[in-house]
From Swiss-Prot:
NCBIfam families: PRK13480.1. GO terms for molecular function: 3'-5'-RNA exonuclease activity; nucleic acid binding. Residues 163-279 form the HD domain. Keywords: Exonuclease, Hydrolase, Nuclease. One of its GO terms (biological process) is rRNA 3'-end processing. This is 3'-5' exoribonuclease YhaM. SUPFAM superfamilies: HD-domain/PDEase-like, Nucleic acid-binding proteins. Pfam families: HD, tRNA_anti-codon. HAMAP family: 3_5_Exoribonuc_YhaM. Shows a 3'-5' exoribonuclease activity.
Amino acid sequence: MKKKIAEYEVGEQVDVFLLIKTATKGIASNGKPFLTVILQDPSGDIEAKLWDVSPEVEKQYVAETIVKVAGDILNYKGRIQLRVKQIRVANENEVTDISDFVEKAPVKKEDMVEKITQYIFEMRNPNIQRLTRHLLNKHQNEFLEYPAATKNHHEFVSGLAYHVVSMLDLAKAISNLYPSLDKDLLYAGVILHDLGKVIELSGPISTTYTLEGNLLGHISIMVNEIGKAADELQIDAEEVLILQHIVLSHHGKAEWGSPKPPLVKEAEILHYIDNLDAKMNMMDRALGRTKPGEYTERVFALDNRSFYKPSFHN
């Protein structure tokens, strides 16, 4: 059985089929065009450069294309890269199903739906419960398929739902420790805070930003969705405004993308839960590709740090 891309070590030779996740054009210092491609399989992704590309070659190597690539693994400024020696588009009789090359959440979709449904069932505030159920039902198919981001954390198929399920479990544990928290508000905030990403992002594979995503962003999108849902359900109550605020403020600061800082206790806690789960996902995945006694590659979204895996951790 062939190794997955995340299992290769620096210096090893690679000769595998991979999926182009993204392809970005650049101009080298010598004035010649090149492509930066992110190649992936179910274990993760890796960056590679294609130098001196012609317009014809550029048209070949686009997102969602399966390629056969040979080369070697190198460490460039703390980041693992694939140095390409040979590359070609795969033939139809070699590989056919793109889904075989994408990373997926480690939990089944039906299990995640069941858990989220149980959290909604536990809500006692009818306005919060109705709004949350309505919006989840409206976007459920995309919610269960989409990643939580294009990069950095939970950027895999069903990553959005997996992120929410993990956050709900965190919210429950924190609410049990601090009973003054409004569980209904916190659970609803967790479920709704990133739901706008089903409109912001293009889909589960080779994910990019939509026009709405670029011009509005998932926070503004979801604030509007909550308002529309309240109108449709004829809910005219303060819960609507508080839920909108929780979504609006969940990034914490204006420089991080939130027009308002958290001004409600549950909004503050949601911000920390979101941040904690995202960072844990980044660290766990980086450390999962690292041997005991060694450092991870640099994690850009965590201040470009390399994390050490203790030698006694298997």
